[in-house]
């Protein structure tokens, strides 16, 4: 649940269990849950281990978000995506650049390729290069010593130095000006989304170009985006996406509910059908946020 109201928290029974999301932006909610004595779990903190894959809400929802971002961009784009050769002439394929090659980014690359676009992508993690290229995308990246250690143990991107960000900005400027569509998916857990596209870079794009910023709710990868708003910047349409999976709700709800059901299977004894939580389980320890009127996760203390 996201941003629980005071009434909803007051209605919770002491010692009850609850799953929450958007935990980094819910400090007030966390403190209220702690004071109430509610045991809460943040499903987004699910460890990146094989046993937890079926419970990973980030992966299931991000997969849909990456797909829908490209579909929305295609709808807004006033040209065709694939190359078409006709008796009346040839239509050049659209050029799509994806920022961030996590689950959402990789799905965006795959979807854009299936629609016939020429796709490039950028990420700070060297591990992403092979994944991007395996999907037919061109990998655009500043390769230096810092990129060798740009990934956390959980598989997420780390925040990079200002020097690296400057190098990256210069490289992106060279590439972005020729792109028709930019899909922004880069996030850093617990921190504001990295700024990857400046206003000057937006102005360098061709009129009619589209930017879909999936990171808008976390500050945005594009300087010109705002969550829930669509802005026109010198002919470039900038969409600050807000809860994009709600626009593909049937599949999003189906996957999310299955993730939660699989997590509940972990908490409930298969024989007695009663709650039986192993507090030493790696998954439980990884996503536990509040218990016994304490915040248990070090990230939020």
Regions found by a protein language model. Name each.
Residues 1-15, 20:
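Single conserved hydrophobic/aromatic residue that forms the stacking wall/gate
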Residues 14-15, 177-178, 206-207:
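Alpha-helix C-terminal capping/helix-to-coil transition sites in glycosyltransferase folds
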Residues 24-48, 192-243:
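Rossmann-fold NAD(P)-binding glycine/threonine-rich loop
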Residues 30, 70, 108-109, 129, ...:
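Generic hydrophobic/aromatic pocket-lining and core-packing "Φ" positions
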Residues 44-87, 216, 222-301:
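Adenosine-phosphate binding glycine-rich loop
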Residues 82-175:
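Glycine-rich phosphate/diphosphate-binding loop of Rossmann-like nucleotide-binding domains
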Residues 150-182, 186-203, 241, 249-254:
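A structured beta-alpha segment of the ubiquitous adenosine-cofactor-binding alpha/beta core
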């Amino acid at each position: 649940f996201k941003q629980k109201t005071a009434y909803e928290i007051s209605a919770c029974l002491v010692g009850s269990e609850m799953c929450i999301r958007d935990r980094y932006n819910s400090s007030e909610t966390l403190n209220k849950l702690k004071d109430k004595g509610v045991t809460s779990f943040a499903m987004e903190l699910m460890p990146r281990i094989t046993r937890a894959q079926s419970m990973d809400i980030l992966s299931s929802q991000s997969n849909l978000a990456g797909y829908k971002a490209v579909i929305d961009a295609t709808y807004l784009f006033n040209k065709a995506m694939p190359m078409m050769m006709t008796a009346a002439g040839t239509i050049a394929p659209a050029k799509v650049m994806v920022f961030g090659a996590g689950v959402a980014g990789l799905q965006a690359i795959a979807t854009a390729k299936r629609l016939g676009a020429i796709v490039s992508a950028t990420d700070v993690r060297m591990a992403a290069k092979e994944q991007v290229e395996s999907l037919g995308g061109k990998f655009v990246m500043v390769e230096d010593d810092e990129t060798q250690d740009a990934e956390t143990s959980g598989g997420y991107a780390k925040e990079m130095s200002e020097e690296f960000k400057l190098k990256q900005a210069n490289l992106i400027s060279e590439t972005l000006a020729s792109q028709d569509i930019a899909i922004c998916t880069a996030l850093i857990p617990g921190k504001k989304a990295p700024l990857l596209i400046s206003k000057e870079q937006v102005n360098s794009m061709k009129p009619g170009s589209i930017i879909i910023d999936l990171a808008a709710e976390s500050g945005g990868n594009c300087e010109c985006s705002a969550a829930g708003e669509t802005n026109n910047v010198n002919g470039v349409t900038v969409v600050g996406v807000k809860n994009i999976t709600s626009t593909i709700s049937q599949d999003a709800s189906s996957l999310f509910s299955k993730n939660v059901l699989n997590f509940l299977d972990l908490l409930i004894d298969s024989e007695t059908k009663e709650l039986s939580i192993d507090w030493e389980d790696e998954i439980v320890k990884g996503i536990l946020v509040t218990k016994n009127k304490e915040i248990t996760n070090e990230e939020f203390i």
